[in-house]
């Protein structure tokens, strides 16, 4: 299972939100490039970027930081937040991003997701951000009536690379992942599922391993890394070790 560190960009800085609330912002670094290089040096094999300004306003406020990060790293970088047109998605791909994450447009313009997936095989990801099982859009400000599981089924056959599923209720809380929701999502999806939201300790990461055979192939970690609750290099090593041992025993040893 791939552990993917997250950098959330707001006004060019590296921040984290609590449950997606723009009024509950914690700033961690004013230099996102240095932060990205730090995650790479600790063993990250992929970086997850979120343009929070883009998600909220639909404008590419953080493009300079995104381009600088992409140019500085040797590992693949993926970005979500405010990507709501074909032109914008292709602009990001052309600047070196490995994957582009589409959230709001998956609800509002599903045909656009399908077209981009056909144009760029393996490079389009659908982000499903759910609150009580229903999809939230536009930076989690608007709540739809669409079930997250229905959206997963809809796009599984569209040629997308993966689904990133975020449980809004646990995001930024360090309270642990919503394992039942992840299991249900994986069972509904024919493409790999990447978990996001709630990771607070090493045991939380290990708790995801039983879901790997169902298709949960990665996990995005944010606040737990920034707060020092999880050491990235140790986590990568621990998940590798846990595949060879009883997961429960390893979790007990680390907790």
UniProtKB/Swiss-Prot annotation:
Pathway: Amino-acid biosynthesis; L-histidine biosynthesis; L-histidine from 5-phospho-alpha-D-ribose 1-diphosphate: step 4/9
Domain of life where this protein originates: Bacteria
Active site: 8, 129
Swiss-Prot/TrEMBL GO biological process terms: L-histidine biosynthetic process; L-tryptophan biosynthetic process
Known EC number: 5.3.1.16
GO cellular component terms listed in the entry, alphabetical order: cytoplasm
Catalysis performed (reactions): 1-(5-phospho-beta-D-ribosyl)-5-[(5-phospho-beta-D-ribosylamino)methylideneamino]imidazole-4-carboxamide = 5-[(5-phospho-1-deoxy-D-ribulos-1-ylimino)methylamino]-1-(5-phospho-beta-D-ribosyl)imidazole-4-carboxamide
Coiled-coil portions: none
Molecular-function GO terms, alphabetical: 1-(5-phosphoribosyl)-5-[(5-phosphoribosylamino)methylideneamino]imidazole-4-carboxamide isomerase activity
Keyword NADP appears in the UniProt entry: no
Compartment annotation: Cytoplasm
Gene3D superfamilies: Aldolase class I
Keywords from the named record: Amino-acid biosynthesis, Cytoplasm, Histidine biosynthesis, Isomerase
UniProt family annotation: Belongs to the HisA/HisF family.
HAMAP family: HisA
Descriptive protein name: 1-(5-phosphoribosyl)-5-[(5-phosphoribosylamino)methylideneamino] imidazole-4-carboxamide isomerase
Organism: Synechococcus sp. (strain CC9605)
Designated gene of the protein: hisA
């Amino acid at each position: 299972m791939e552990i993917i560190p997250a950098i959330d960009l707001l006004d060019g800085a590296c921040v984290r939100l609590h449950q997606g609330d723009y009024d509950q912002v914690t700033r961690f670094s004013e230099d996102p490039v240095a932060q990205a290089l730090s995650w790479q040096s600790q063993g990250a094999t992929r970086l997850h970027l979120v343009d929070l300004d883009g998600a909220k306003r639909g404008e590419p406020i953080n493009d300079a930081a995104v381009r600088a990060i992409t140019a500085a790293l040797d590992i693949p970088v993926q970005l979500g937040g405010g990507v709501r047109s074909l032109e914008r998605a292709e602009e990001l791909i052309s600047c070196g991003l490995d994957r582009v994450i589409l959230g709001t447009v998956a609800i509002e313009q599903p045909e656009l997701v399908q077209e981009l997936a056909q144009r760029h095989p393996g490079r389009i990801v659908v982000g499903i951000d759910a609150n009580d099982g229903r999809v939230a859009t536009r930076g989690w400000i608007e709540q739809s009536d669409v079930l997250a599981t229905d959206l997963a089924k809809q796009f599984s056959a569209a040629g997308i690379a993966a689904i990133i599923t975020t449980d809004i209720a646990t995001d930024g809380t360090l309270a642990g992942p919503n394992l039942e929701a992840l299991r249900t999502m994986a069972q509904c999806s024919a493409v790999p599922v990447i978990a996001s939201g709630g990771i607070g300790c090493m045991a939380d990461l290990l708790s995801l391993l039983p879901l790997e055979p169902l298709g949960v192939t990665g996990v995005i970690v944010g606040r737990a890394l920034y707060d020092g609750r999880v050491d990235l290099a140790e986590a990568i090593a621990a998940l590798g070790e846990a595949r060879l041992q009883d997961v429960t025993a390893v979790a007990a040893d680390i907790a």
